[in-house]
């Protein structure tokens, strides 16, 4: 399975430019739909364009499953923007896109997860509730993540405006295998294992 997980894609995406140039990217902004600030969505769009990717944008909370399926099947890379982790995992599970994603990743496609898109890869996302408010219409009975990795990404570590909350999560969830990353770091996961890479 190939994953690139980060806090802020437009700051670190160029680290994996070989994986993106001339590739077809399914761009999923769904997590950002419930957020006030969404500047990171535009900056990610801009970077993909600059790196030569062919981008198809799709919102999994409103599109028909058949459309999502055809976009995912056609893509080389599947990218999830940041936003609200609970809203994103709810939409993935509710629509069955979670299983579709796993099927496509099993074919060797690359998933890029930014912030919420990285958080949802963990076995559970309960640890992030202090950073992400659970929506009132959250429809899942638990906080299970996609369980693609055996650790828990903590994005924006010690980075404003998340400095205090990320410190708090590190302390309160010290029993979890947390992997804190700042906005200039990314985690590369492949068959060999995982490593943190950094943008100078």
Segments predicted by a language model, with ranges:
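Glycine/Thr-rich phosphate-binding loops of Rossmann-like dinucleotide-binding domains
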Residues: 13, 35, 88-89, 121-122, ...
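Class I SAM-dependent methyltransferase SAM-binding "motif I" and its flanking Rossmann-like core
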Residues: 97-159
């Amino acid at each position: 399975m190939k994953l690139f997980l980060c806090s802020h894609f437009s700051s670190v995406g160029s680290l994996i430019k070989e994986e993106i140039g001339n590739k077809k990217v399914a761009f999923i902004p769904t997590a950002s739909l419930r957020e006030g600030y969404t500047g990171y969505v535009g900056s990610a769009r801009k970077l993909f364009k600059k790196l030569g990717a062919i981008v198809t944008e799709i919102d999994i909370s409103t599109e028909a499953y058949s459309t999502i399926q055809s976009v995912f099947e056609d893509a080389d890379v599947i990218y999830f923007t940041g936003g609200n982790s609970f809203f994103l995992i709810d939409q993935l599970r509710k629509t069955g896109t979670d299983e579709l994603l796993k099927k496509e990743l099993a074919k060797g496609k690359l998933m890029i997860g930014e912030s919420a898109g990285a958080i949802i890869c963990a076995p559970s996302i309960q640890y992030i509730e202090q950073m992400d408010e659970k929506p009132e219409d959250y429809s899942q009975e638990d906080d299970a993540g996609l369980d693609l990795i055996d650790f828990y990404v903590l994005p924006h570590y010690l980075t404003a405006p998340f400095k205090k909350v990320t410190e708090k999560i590190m302390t309160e969830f010290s029993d979890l295998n947390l992997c804190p990353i700042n906005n200039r770091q990314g985690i590369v996961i492949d068959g060999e294992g995982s490593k943190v890479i950094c943008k100078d």
